[in-house]
């Protein structure tokens, strides 16, 4: 079956990466159509929401390329499967990553199903910076060629079956090349800046947004020794390793070193801080990860060595991963790691291959093997 007989639906975000993805697939001979997903019901007067601008840009790009653009509203699915999870995690004192859940529930579930069933697609495509390869009859996900833009961290929940049905055209390119292609082809998104912030919040102030949905619960800030240092406006506004926005100055040991968030006592509603970025309470020897997703869909039966990222854009950390009897996995770092944050994801790699990952359930400060 040649590419000309295969239909690809490209998730058009109104950004340069998806725009160039559509163009590249056309060059490869596929039948290409676009789909714009509306995932958030915003107030039309909201100065921060760019959904209407993004749709307009997607329409212009598709017009330039001469392809059809479909639109679909996944706001209900987004609220039920992504946003409510996001709120529950913050209520529990954790720091979630909704972009990972959005990829899992919307882009590679709702979108994939809609494209296959309603639009008769052979593949979907996105502008993510990842690559794929087939080995032993199964598809694997590799980091994007542009290490600065690699997005495999956000896609670890994908299975080999998802990857088999998805094309990632810009994963083989570096970002400057993507912009150059967009400019050459006269695409309106060529100079559009990359989106930042959480997918549904956009550029607005996180604190203001969260206050609309979760009541703030002020409480004390304490040092690791239990000394009262001030008051926080709500545990949900703080994350481990945070330095700015504590408003407590360089007191206590008079060293003048900044304070860092090292823990949250959710039961007492206390934010715990320590002074200096080398403070041992800021560091973890390992972690316990739950809700595991393996790209192969086969959980490793025994301990193995690999590397892990505990946040996006982090250097790979050599580690030992051990399955536990309850289905969780214990991760032991070769060296201590700062600001390991419950609610975030631990993503595992073997060289360039993304093996999978899970949610950080707890940090391990003194290492004890828990089998």
UniProtKB/Swiss-Prot annotation:
Region feature Interaction with tRNA, mapped onto this chain: 149-151, 311-312
InterPro entries assigned: MnmA-like (IPR004506), MnmA-like_C (IPR046885), MnmA-like_central (IPR046884), MnmA-like_central_sf (IPR023382), Rossmann-like_a/b/a_fold (IPR014729)
Residues annotated as catalytic: 102 (nucleophile), 199 (cysteine persulfide intermediate)
Domain of life: Bacteria
Catalyzed reaction equations: S-sulfanyl-L-cysteinyl-[protein] + uridine(34) in tRNA + AH2 + ATP = 2-thiouridine(34) in tRNA + L-cysteinyl-[protein] + A + AMP + diphosphate + H(+)
Keywords (A to Z) from UniProt: ATP-binding, Cytoplasm, Disulfide bond, Nucleotide-binding, RNA-binding, Transferase, tRNA processing, tRNA-binding
GO CC annotation, single: cytoplasm
This enzyme's EC code(s): 2.8.1.13
One GO term (biological process): tRNA wobble position uridine thiolation
UniProt-annotated site: Interaction with tRNA, residues: 128, 344
Keyword Transferase applies: yes
Keyword Zinc: no
Localisation per UniProt entry: Cytoplasm
Residues the entry annotates as binding ATP: 11-18, 37, 127
Homology family: Belongs to the MnmA/TRMU family.
Record's protein name: tRNA-specific 2-thiouridylase MnmA
Organism: Idiomarina loihiensis (strain ATCC BAA-735 / DSM 15497 / L2-TR)
Lineage, uppermost ranks: Bacteria, Pseudomonadati, Pseudomonadota, Gammaproteobacteria, Alteromonadales
Encoding gene (name): mnmA
